[in-house]
A protein has these predicted regions:
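Extracellular carbohydrate-recognition regions
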Residues: 19-43, 173, 180
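Extra-cytoplasmic beta-strand recognition segments
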Residues: 26-30, 63, 75-103, 133-139, ...
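Extracellular glycan-recognition surfaces and repeat-rich motifs
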Residues: 30-62
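Extracellular beta-strand ligand-recognition surfaces/modules
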Residues: 105-107, 132-172
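Extracellular carbohydrate recognition and processing domains
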Residues: 113-145
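Juxtacatalytic substrate-recognition/specificity segment
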Residues: 184-286, 290
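Active-site-proximal alpha-helical
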Residues: 220, 332-425
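Zinc-dependent metallopeptidase catalytic helix centered on the HExxH motif
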Residues: 263-329
């Protein structure tokens, strides 16, 4: 008897699983179960999703997703009744044929209700036989999570996310992450969950580092007058699913790339009292106005302001970070940013460089103190976007930001701390950025 073939085109719509089981297993052998528990999702482009009665591991059922063009297609299952705050691991087996571009074949979470949109498994490309991938995740505040087995990713970093080719999915499993594989420590504001194999320092040393991160968290709140995620703890989580070149991705959880030097950074916290520039930077991002308030059109580049928040915290807490094999403690961080100023604006070169602008903000701090920035950020964070004037370009936003610093200083800080030729170079450099 010929086996039935169930084909789901990308425009089809199915019900969402409402099962309350905390450990989920799916081998795609049963068509009725598939139609009850899984829905298809197509974000863009062409392609086809099929549940096949054979073709999986040991010729069992499987899902096949295929597209000759770059696309983002996935089958999705919503899990409910999960324990809030608990770390789970979803794993699946997949094989690929000519998968190219974007995030390739990938497991990920639907971001609805989550504070992190980028969590994913390792990206798989090319042609390969069956192998396992995994992703660790924490459910939303309702104890829910929607797992996605996909070809391509709905949104992209520099690689565009979307992929082409064919992927087969089988043996999807969700279970609590084991203590054997995941190392966990917790402090007042931070929950740290790392690959156990990468933790090479003692619990006491980890606790000392987390205590420093708590102090930084409090300092960020003192600077901007707000805290993210309604005060919920920030999870720092190792993940295999980040593009090469990305150290980490901000959100909750902060995703720390498993493929970068995790162990050496931890060891530097002991050897050099290095608080970790990259981690402080990502925590700085989650204190942005856009993250806390979903507003803040004045902020033309939060890479600058995440680091500027860090400079405040380093000075307030007496913290140390290292860059280019040099350790900077407290207010000495200005010397690091002066390097970039001297290479660009200070040399008369109109090259867009956020670190150079950062140096000019620290010059303002040297003259007026941090209080003017504390007051300026409070004024800015109190505004929603409808209360802001129309800002045409990044230079307008730069001046708008400094107008609030001037209001706090009761003096025009642009006039007192910038030379006209500097402003001309800054304007030109920001115009160059707008045309990139």
């Amino acid at each position: 008897m010929k086996k039935a073939l169930f084909i789901f085109f990308v425009s089809a719509l199915y019900g969402v699983c409402q099962g309350s089981e905390k450990v989920f297993v799916e081998n795609f052998d049963r068509a009725r179960r598939f139609s009850r528990h899984w829905t298809t999702d197509a974000v863009s482009g062409s392609g086809r999703i099929e549940r096949l009665p054979d073709g999986g591991i040991d010729d069992s059922g499987c899902v096949r997703i295929t597209s000759s063009e770059r696309t983002s297609l996935a089958v999705k299952c919503q899990l409910t009744g999960l324990e809030q705050g608990r770390l789970y691991r979803v794993s699946a087996r997949l094989k690929c044929e000519d998968v190219r571009d974007g995030r390739g074949a990938v497991l990920f979470l639907d971001p609805e209700g989550l504070d992190q949109s980028w969590n994913a498994s390792e990206f798989v490309y090319g042609t390969s036989d069956w192998r396992e991938v995994y992703m660790d995740f924490v459910p939303d505040t309702l104890g829910e999570a929607t797992i996605c087995c996909g070809l391509g990713f709905p949104w992209g970093t520099y690689n565009g996310g979307k992929a082409s080719g064919t992927v087969w999915w089988d043996d999807v499993r969700v279970e609590p992450a084991s203590d054997e594989s995941v190392y966990t420590r917790e402090s007042e504001h931070i929950v740290l969950k790392l690959d156990r194999s990468k933790v090479t320092i003692s619990d006491a040393d980890i606790d000392a580092w987390l205590s420093n991160l708590d102090r930084v968290y409090d300092a960020y709140g003192d600077l901007v007058g707000e805290v993210p995620y309604e005060g919920r703890k920030i999870l720092i989580l190792n993940t295999p699913g980040i593009e090469p070149g990305y150290w980490a991705l901000a959100g909750n959880p902060i995703l720390w790339n498993s493929h970068v030097a995790v162990s050496p950074l931890l060891e530097r916290t002991v050897e050099f009292d290095d608080w970790g520039f990259g981690i402080l930077h990502e925590i700085g991002h989650v204190f942005s106005q856009s993250n806390i308030k979903n507003s803040g059109r004045w902020n033309w580049n939060d890479e600058i302001f995440a680091n500027f928040r860090m400079s405040y915290a380093l000075e307030k807490c007496g913290g140390t970070v290292s860059q280019r094999d040099v350790c900077y403690r407290g207010a000495d961080i200005i010397n690091y940013y002066k390097i970039f100023y001297d290479e660009t604006i200070g040399a008369g070169i109109a090259k867009n460089n956020g670190d150079a602008l950062h140096y000019t903000f620290l010059r303002i701090k040297e003259r007026y103190g941090w209080k003017v920035f504390e007051q300026a950020f409070r004024m800015l964070y109190a505004l929603d976007d409808t209360q802001m004037p129309e800002l045409q370009n990044d230079y307008d936003k730069f001046l708008y930001f400094l107008s609030h610093v001037s209001a706090a200083a009761d003096e025009d800080v642009v006039r007192t701390t910038y030379m006209p030729e500097e402003l001309a170079l800054i304007k030109k450099s920001l115009e160059n950025r707008n045309h990139l």
